[in-house]
Amino acid sequence: MLGQVRSYDGDSWVDWQWVGDHLDDIRNAAQTHLVLTVEVVVLGVLLALPLSLAAARRPALRSIVLGVSSVLYTIPSLAAFALLIPYTGLTSRWTVLIPLVSYTLVVLVRNFISGLDAVPVEARAAADGMGFSHRQRVLRVELPLAIPAIMAGVRLATVSTIGLVTVSAIIGQQSLGLLIRDGLERDFRTLIVVGAGLALLMAITADLLLSACSRALTPWRRAR
């Protein structure tokens, strides 16, 4: 991926000349890592939201959804990749997407349900008294009031996914994990530092941005 590693000062943690020579490769790895993370989280939200809305109203379904998502979360990512490779292929994006989306569900579903459970009974009663249909009540009352818990789940899922995407380098998926893997294989610390550092920076930045989005979507909380 990154060509030959030239000799460098072994006492230095980062070979800045090498970094400058491979900026395009590093940028591509970071961009692919970010895109894959966004795909995983978006798919996770699209699955978790309807599941949570249905499970919040049905105790039996809630137990099933939470139980299944928890079981999926216990499967190691490498084992999940190995199980899927015969069906999706070694280089298929779905080999990574399916397990990582499954992992987000345990975080997203629990937070979404907690947020819906926290909606005051009085708010639901007021919506019913105003003649809202069930759909209107969910869209205009319950989901807005559940936003803090929903966004907390999205933040946690995003940060954890950024870390998990690095593991996909084991099966050759392009990401910042490839830098770390190549650095370990070549005993070249610059690759390790750049890959791990950018993944950490991406996680911190994503968390701050999502936290700001959460505050922007809940102006009534700032007024307290």
Each PLM stretch: what is its role?
Residues 59, 114-117, 121, 193-224:
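C-terminal transmembrane helix and the adjacent membrane-cytosol boundary/short C-terminal tail
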Residues 86-87, 164-199, 218, 224:
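Glycine-rich helix-loop "coupling/hinge" segments at transmembrane-helix boundaries
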Residues 28, 51-84, 100, 110-114:
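Cytoplasmic-entry segments and transmembrane alpha-helices of multi-pass inner-membrane transporters
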Residues 111-150, 176, 180:
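Short cytoplasmic-facing helical segments at TM-TM junctions of multi-pass membrane proteins
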Residues 134-167, 194:
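Transmembrane alpha-helices
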Residues 25-36, 85-107, 146-147, 191, ...:
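Loop-to-helix entry region at the N-terminal start of transmembrane alpha-helices
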Residues 4-41:
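Periplasmic/extracellular loop-to-transmembrane helix junction in inner-membrane transport proteins
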